[in-house]
Regions:
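N-terminal glycine-/serine-/threonine-rich phosphate-binding loop
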Residues: 1-32, 52-65
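Generic secondary-structure signature for well-ordered alpha-helical cores
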Residues: 18, 22-25, 63-71, 117-125, ...
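Solvent-exposed alpha-helices and their adjacent loops that cap or buttress functional pockets
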Residues: 24-26, 108, 154-159
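Short glycine-rich phosphate-binding loop at a beta-alpha junction
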Residues: 30-35, 73-74
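Active-site histidine-anchored catalytic micro-motif
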Residues: 41-46, 50-57, 64-83, 108
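Short acidic, glycine/serine/threonine-rich loops at helix termini
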Residues: 44-46, 85-89, 177-179
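Ligand-binding beta-strand-loop-alpha-helix segment within the catalytic cores
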Residues: 69-131, 138
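Glycine-rich, aromatic-bearing surface loops/beta-hairpins
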Residues: 114, 118-185
């Protein structure tokens, strides 16, 4: 992988997370889930062409932006680990999410989860979370880890590298019927 392509991936990842955060209105302590197929980023087929370099470039683009705002990064593993989440122990404890025992590797968990495991201060795996927003890079199906109600968010870019991206924020359920008043549009 060329340095130019790594820089492109990093810049696109940073731009995507910044645009989504602008629309999602997350606050300090919220959780942001990222599912990332490094295979799709480099133009391969999901699960077949894992790239630590691509995953590291995504991490370099996303992690500092979230850390600056005090937002927790949750990294979704691949389907071989049942799409478990890698996150900081402190975040899991804050939300009461139960730890499971596994250490991701590029071909069992994915390069993205492996990269995050190596970068986090005190990484743990959890089976399921309810994130406040997230980015799906390359068709990784993050919906199972989003709070209800998920709201699609369109960004100015539609790809990171060669991978399609889909983004979502969440909002509380609107209840009460026609006489109710809501604070959100």
């Amino acid at each position: 992988m060329t340095d130019a392509f790594k820089q492109q991936i990093q810049a696109e990842a940073r731009q995507a997370v910044e645009e989504l955060l602008e629309q999602a209105k997350l606050k300090k302590g919220d959780v942001f889930v990222v599912g990332c197929s490094s295979s799709e980023i480099v133009g391969g087929h999901i699960g077949k062409d894992s790239s630590l370099e691509a995953a590291q470039a995504v991490y370099a683009g996303i992690a500092p932006v979230l850390a600056q705002r005090g937002i927790w990064l949750a990294a979704q593993c691949c389907e071989h680990l049942n799409r478990a989440i890698i996150m900081e122990r402190e975040a899991a404890e804050q939300y009461g999410w139960e730890e499971v025992c596994v250490v991701p590797r590029p071909h069992a968990g994915g390069s993205w989860a492996t990269t995050c495991w190596k970068q986090f201060k005190a990484p743990i795996a959890v089976e399921e979370i309810r994130a406040h927003a997230g980015i799906d890079i390359g068709g990784t199906l993050i919906g199972m880890h989003l709070r209800r109600v998920a709201v699609p968010v369109r960004l100015s870019l539609s790809k990171i590298g060669e991978a399609n991206i889909l983004c979502a924020r969440t909002r509380p359920k609107l209840i009460g019927g026609e006489r109710a008043k809501y604070t959100e549009e």
